[in-house]
């Protein structure tokens, strides 16, 4: 699914596509011209094809109509788009991004960030303490910052954005949080708050402990919650 948002955060255009870029439906109340399809592609109305900088792509066939200009360097098939377009992209019409752009270092950064964030999230679910969502957001990203690795921090920030997009989508079906569907403006505000907390944790000074950095997100009157977090090693 793709969407365009205006300066106020309102969805001005949205479209749903299958794995190969075929448009399934479109919501365009303002009659906007929006030609973008899969990453790097622009819809050509006259031909019905997608322009990919170096060649044209046919979404009905799921392949390019001309051979790869870089030959076999782009893969064994001279006409193929990434064999798994869910995980691979080809923004220039040359070779899949997982071959051309993503290096082993980036994959390791992503995995390290994912491990820290997911471990902290699992602790949050296990402890099941009310009113601690933002605290755990802060702690997860603060833990990433302590690696002092810009690449891992960048990956973590991207994962944080992906989670908020996922949460927004879940809310559309009443499956987010307490299963009470929020309005668009309420959900945008919720997303903004979470992202701000993520940044607060991620920018923790090297001389500051994560428990000190994030303790303000815990109500000081909630003594049992504080005790549980201390026992779990999250607070001093």
Curated annotation (Swiss-Prot):
<dbReference type="InterPro" id="IPR001826">
    <property type="entry name" value="RHS"/>
</dbReference>
<dbReference type="Pfam" id="PF03527">
    <property type="entry name" value="RHS"/>
</dbReference>
<protein>
    <recommendedName>
        <fullName>Putative uncharacterized protein YlbH</fullName>
    </recommendedName>
</protein>
<comment type="similarity">
    <text>Belongs to the RHS family.</text>
</comment>
<dbReference type="InterPro" id="IPR050708">
    <property type="entry name" value="T6SS_VgrG/RHS"/>
</dbReference>
<dbReference type="InterPro" id="IPR022385">
    <property type="entry name" value="Rhs_assc_core"/>
</dbReference>
């Amino acid at each position: 699914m793709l969407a365009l948002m205006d300066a106020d955060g309102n969805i001005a255009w949205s479209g749903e596509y299958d794995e190969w870029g075929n448009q399934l439906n479109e919501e365009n109340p303002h009659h906007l011209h929006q030609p973008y399809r899969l990453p790097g592609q622009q819809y050509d109305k006259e031909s019905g094809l997608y322009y990919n900088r170096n060649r044209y792509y046919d979404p009905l066939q799921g392949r390019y109509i001309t051979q790869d200009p870089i030959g076999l360097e782009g893969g064994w098939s001279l006409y193929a788009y990434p064999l798994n377009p869910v995980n691979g992209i080809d923004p220039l019409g040359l070779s899949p991004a997982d071959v051309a752009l993503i290096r082993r270092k980036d994959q390791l950064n992503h995995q390290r960030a994912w491990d820290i964030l997911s471990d902290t999230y699992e602790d949050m679910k296990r402890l099941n303490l009310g009113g601690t969502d933002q605290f755990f957001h802060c702690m997860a990203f603060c833990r990433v910052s302590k690696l002092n690795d810009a690449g891992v921090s960048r990956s973590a920030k991207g994962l944080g954005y992906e989670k908020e997009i996922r949460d927004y989508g879940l809310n559309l079906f009443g499956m987010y949080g307490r299963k009470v569907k929020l309005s668009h403006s309420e959900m945008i505000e919720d997303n903004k708050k979470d992202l701000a907390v993520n940044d607060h944790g991620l920018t923790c000074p090297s001389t500051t402990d994560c428990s000190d950095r994030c303790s303000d997100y815990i109500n000081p009157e909630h003594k049992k919650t504080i005790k549980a977090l201390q026992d779990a090693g999250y607070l001093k």
